[in-house]
Amino acid sequence: MRFCKKCVMPDTKPDLHFDEEGVCDACRSQEAKNQNINWQEREKEFFELIKKYKKHPVYDCVIGVSGGKDSTFQVVKMLELGLNPLCVCFEPSVPTKIGRKNLDNLNHLGVDLIHIKRDPKVYQKLAREAFIRTGDNEWQNHLGIFTSVPRIAVNFGVPLIIWGESPQIEYGGPASSKNKNILGREWLEEFGGLLGNRASDMLGVNGIAEKDLFLYTYPSDEELQRVGVTGLFLGYYFKWDYKKILEISKKYGFLTLDHPVETTYENFENLDCYSNHVHDYLKYCKYGFGRATDNACLDIRLGYISREEGVRLVQKYDGKPPKKAIKKYLEFSGFSEEEFQKIVDSFTNKKIFKRDENGKFLRDYDGSLVRKDECVLK
């Protein structure tokens, strides 16, 4: 297991590549953001692009929102540019009180908001089956977010969708994907986290019918072409710095916690849903890195902390089971603690974590998995 020489990301991250100097492509991408990209030209390109979309009689664009810092910033930015966005929130798996406050705050910025309250029975069936199949407790929610937004765009006849950061630019990925400014079906299937499991694969599971999957199914090419739907990454056109975005969002009423969230050292991540913290923990079990690593890597690349400090933060915060979030998730999903742990263990990486003579994973005093010596971050 190798770690990037500049940040602290391991080579187990899917689609991440290291060069001959041992530096990951996400770090190289950050260098390009600072040195090779003319952001003024890209901003001009965006301003010219949106002119043709400011013709809709009511809404100029659709924005998928959670009430988080990024979606708050997206709404603020579009309002500043004189656009009238229609906002769409696909209900989180296990909503939080602060998340609801932030969503209400976003609404009160002066936008119409469609809050999709999905059928809880169908949703739970999808959640349970997807977790068993993929080891991803948020598969159904990520799918719902990425399909319901274009569905609303099609049904309301609004051709422009505004997404936030470009994950491949910020977190690394194939070189060809970094120059893509559009989120469409191709991006969803390659990078949307479906893990080889499509909505259609759930047909018939515990009585799930085709009509139950409507919100989880991407609009047809014919529908998209009829409206001319295009989904753009705002992070392709504007230089993305999450701390600056956070400060702007706080200025417009975004709330943070007075303590770190369970899976990292920050107090503003994934505030809308408890289940997201379980998702971060599962990522750690599969790939050996979690949300604290993600945050530390961004902070290192943006120059906010040193790599040495990043190592310290990752060692302190990454990999600890989010006990409160797991409890909330079990109440929502109906899994027992034993069932949950059995599924987690089935997806836990045997190449990274130690096991005893019976094949059982070793755990620390706080329940954290014990890493093999060659997989310890230094």
Each language-model region and where it sits:
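Nucleotide-activated chemistry modules centered on ATP-dependent adenylation/adenylyltransferase
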Residues: 1-61, 77-378
